[in-house]
A protein has these predicted regions:
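Conserved short alpha-helical segments that host acidic/polar catalytic motifs at enzyme active sites
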Residues: 2-254, 259-316, 322, 410
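Secondary-structure transition/capping motifs at alpha-helix termini
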Residues: 153-157, 183-184, 313-317, 335-342, ...
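A conserved beta-strand->alpha-helix junction
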Residues: 167-168, 172-175, 341-352, 429-446
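Amphipathic alpha-helical
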Residues: 172-184, 323, 331, 335-353
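PRPP-dependent phosphoribosyltransferase catalytic core
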Residues: 194, 209-210, 245-247, 251, ...
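Flexible glycine/proline-rich, aromatic-decorated loop/lid segments
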Residues: 230-237, 354-368, 408, 413
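Extended, hydrophobic alpha-helical segments in both membrane/secreted and soluble proteins
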Residues: 319, 326-333, 337, 341, ...
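Short, glycine/charge-rich flexible loops or terminal/linker lids adjacent to PRPP-binding catalytic cores
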Residues: 338-383, 394, 420
């Protein structure tokens, strides 16, 4: 079983058996994961964490893990797959304790393997530490040097040779730095380590008796604090808090670290806040029932649809979404345009999000498995098809082909996020017209000030200075390092 409690870790090999062999292609966790932590003596913290991760499953579908402490030792269980596939009743019943953290992973560039599953685990001078991370650190080169400079065994061992760690795993580097505190407590050590980090991060971590959480000074990823009758909870989104019956207290502030133990809740600010929340949380990443910076994600997406209708009107008979991510924006487009709203696709609920799957082969296979056109709804009609984004164009191309095969007269695609590359994408999807919301329109729909948002995916303007690419330690931002220019256009395409 994929348990971990002593710092030694194993993973499943190609034959399904557990192996200690390292995959040299492994890379660290990326930016769209889900993290959860709970401190609640007397509660079943493993099951609370399980349900919290279940509510955050949309943020990552490749692996899941839970670490639990009973006050004497930390036990970590993690494996590849969905939360419901990794954990069963027997496993959860074996994870007894008063505090826990959990993680669900999505990798954008790294290999999808057991070694990159979280939480990470590490022994310390006075116990152990387990840590979960949502984000990207861009100074891994500096962090690796800092780990190598640690005195004692930490500095003598090559990170690449340690089971469970690779030279590009930023989370393992942070865990190693946190764990080295021979002359101070973990709380004090964390306040030294966190200012060393550059990039986007939301951490939850724990030792045997204390839960910790921290958010980067820009607040790029969301992190929320909640209250239980007998404890505290932190999670990537408030929807996870509501799922387990916790009340929402507030967002963890940018540059803030929380400490939760038997003495209650303590807050430390390790850096001045410079809010730059990721705008793509509003577009796609977050659940529609989440609230970020006091703005309903669902309301933001509906407003994006209204804005799309104002920017790119078209004569049509039906506005239809690409379910489920395009539904709020499609409803907004229909409301603003006066064109009837309807469902033109039926979705197979048992197929994962195609954007989340790591393999291109799986993505292409998933397109036909995921959606089918409702012929009686689309035949003989001019359609406005609303979705939240175009990443590679594969999804939209297959969808448009299905709609035309079902008898659609025209297919007009409307996207509720700005354009990345008009030449590469628009020329290949096969729509009668293609319209993207403007950058200003998207920002206005979020209800946030432009200065408080990170729009680097669309503008190439990052809230933190990027180092030389050769020092990143991994290709963290392979899709956006070229700083694409956002182009607002409505190209008219020929029918295929």
């Amino acid at each position: 079983m994929p348990f971990q409690s002593s710092g030694h870790s194993a993973r499943r090999g190609g034959d399904g058996r557990l192996t200690d062999a390292l995959d040299p292609q492994d890379q660290g966790p990326q930016d769209a994961c889900g993290v959860f932590g709970v401190w609640a003596p007397g509660e079943d913290v493993a099951k609370l964490t399980y349900f919290g991760l279940y509510a955050l499953q949309h943020r990552g579908q490749e692996s899941a893990g839970i670490a639990v402490s009973n006050g004497r030792q930390i036990l970590v269980y993690k494996d590849m797959g969905l939360v419901s596939q990794v954990f069963d009743e027997t496993t959860l019943d074996s994870l007894k304790g008063h505090l826990a953290i959990g993680h669900s992973r999505y990798s954008t560039t790294g290999a999808s393997t057991w070694h990159n599953a979280q939480p990470t685990f590490r022994p310390t001078p006075d116990g152990s530490i387990a840590l979960g991370h949502n984000g990207n650190l861009i100074n891994t080169h500096e962090l690796r040097e800092a780990v190598a400079a640690l005195p004692g065994p930490e500095g003598e061992l090559d990170l690449a040779q340690r089971p469970g760690e690779t030279s590009t795993n930023d989370t393992s580097l942070v865990t190693a730095l946190m764990a080295h505190h021979p002359d101070q407590g973990l709380e004090e050590r964390a306040l030294e380590v966190l200012p060393m980090l550059r990039g986007a991060f939301c951490f939850v971590w724990m030792n045997e008796d204390t839960l910790y959480a921290a958010r980067d000074p820009q607040g790029i990823r969301p992190l929320v604090l909640g209250r239980l009758d007998r404890g505290w909870v932190v999670a990537s989104e408030d929807a996870a808090l509501k799922t387990i019956g916790a009340s929402v207290v507030r967002e963890v502030e940018p540059g803030e670290m929380l400490v939760i133990d038997e003495n209650g809740l303590r807050s430390h600010h390790f850096a001045e806040p410079e809010p730059k929340g990721c705008v793509f949380e509003y577009v796609y990443l977050a659940r529609p029932d989440a609230t970020i910076a006091a703005r309903s994600v669902h309301q933001a997406r509906v407003e994006m649809g209204r804005q799309l209708a104002r920017e790119f009107p078209v004569e049509a008979d039906l506005v239809m979404p690409v379910p489920e991510s395009g539904t709020p924006a499609a409803a907004g487009y229909a409301e603003e345009s006066g064109i009837p709203f309807g469902q033109g696709f039926v979705k197979n609920a048992y197929v994962g999000r195609t954007f989340i799957q790591p393999s291109q082969t799986l993505r292409q296979l998933g397109l036909r498995l995921k959606l089918n056109a409702l012929e009686h709804m689309v035949r003989g009609k001019r359609l406005v098809v609303v979705d939240d984004s175009i990443v590679r164009g594969n999804t939209q191309r297959a969808q448009i082909r299905m709609l035309r095969e079902a008898g659609a007269l025209e297919v007009h695609v409307r996207i509720s996020s700005p354009l990345l590359d008009v030449e590469e994408i628009a020329a290949s999807v096969g729509a009668d017209s293609l319209g993207y919301i403007s950058l200003d329109g998207m920002i206005e729909s979020t209800g946030q000030q432009r200065s408080a948002l990170c729009t680097a995916c669309f503008t190439g303007e990052y809230p933190v200075e990027l180092p030389d690419e050769s020092l990143l330690g991994k290709h963290l931002l392979e899709a956006t390092l070229s700083s694409p220019t956002m182009v607002r256009a409505l190209p008219v395409l020929n029918n295929p």
